[in-house]
């Protein structure tokens, strides 16, 4: 069984449900979450809404877009019982721990490039199963189980992504991430 460490990343408690540029997106997300779909289908439906109405970096203030050189910063932009919206600010070189989620998620890149390494839980170890470069405009949706990954900004500019989680993250200390501390194996192709 995987050894899992629960941890919460730094989150600014910014609640602005009527933030300019977000109202239409919130309405579309709300409509999808009310359909009663299973988590995977909800994540994919919300990803479609995000793809169609992805805001630009100007959704955030100049100060919010700066981030922090010492740690990944997230800004909680909206929360309600069915979902929350966060903006993540990735300075060059910043990366997450290897983690998965306890709720569905959809995300889109609005600035820069985020490199994602995907893993499979094989009990006593994780196996790397793929790598993806998510560029501006790229959107993805996923739900547990099987969403183990690590995200890294390997570029030389700040990356910004918008994340929609199927949980209310407004309570202090709430996180949708589970971190993994297991040996990693890479699948090698046969020649």
Predicted regions and their residues:
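Asparagine-centered strand-capping/turn motif at beta-strand->loop junctions
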Residues: 151-155
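N-terminal leader/capping segments at the start of a protein or of a new domain
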Residues: 1-56
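Short acidic-glycine-tyrosine-enriched beta hairpin
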Residues: 121-148
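A short glycine-rich, His/Asp/Glu-containing loop-to-beta-strand
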Residues: 62-92, 139
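Glycine- and acidic-residue-biased ligand/ion/polar-headgroup-sensing regions
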Residues: 103-120
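A short hydrophobic beta-strand segment most commonly corresponding to one strand
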Residues: 106-108, 156-172
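Conserved short histidine dyad/triad with adjacent acidic residue
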Residues: 86-100, 144-146
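Domain-scale activation on soluble regions of proteins
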Residues: 164, 171-179, 183-191
């Amino acid at each position: 069984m995987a050894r899992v460490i629960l941890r919460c990343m730094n989150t600014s408690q910014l609640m602005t449900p009527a933030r300019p540029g977000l109202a239409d997106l919130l309405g579309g997300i709300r409509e999808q979450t009310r359909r009663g779909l299973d988590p995977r289908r909800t994540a994919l439906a919300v990803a479609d809404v995000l793809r169609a109405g992805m805001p630009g970096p100007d959704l955030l203030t100049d100060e919010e877009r700066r981030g922090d050189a010492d740690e990944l910063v997230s800004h909680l932009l909206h929360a309600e019982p069915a979902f929350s919206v966060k903006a993540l600010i990735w300075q060059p070189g910043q990366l997450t721990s290897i983690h998965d989620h306890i709720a569905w998620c959809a995300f889109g890149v609005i600035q820069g490039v985020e490199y994602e390494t995907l893993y499979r839980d094989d009990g006593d170890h994780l196996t790397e199963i793929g790598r993806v470069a998510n560029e501006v405009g790229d959107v993805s949706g996923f739900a547990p189980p099987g969403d183990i990954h690590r995200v890294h900004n390997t570029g030389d500019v700040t990356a910004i992504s918008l994340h929609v989680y199927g949980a209310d993250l407004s309570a202090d200390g709430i996180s949708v991430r589970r971190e993994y501390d297991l040996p990693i194996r890479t699948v090698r192709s046969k020649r």
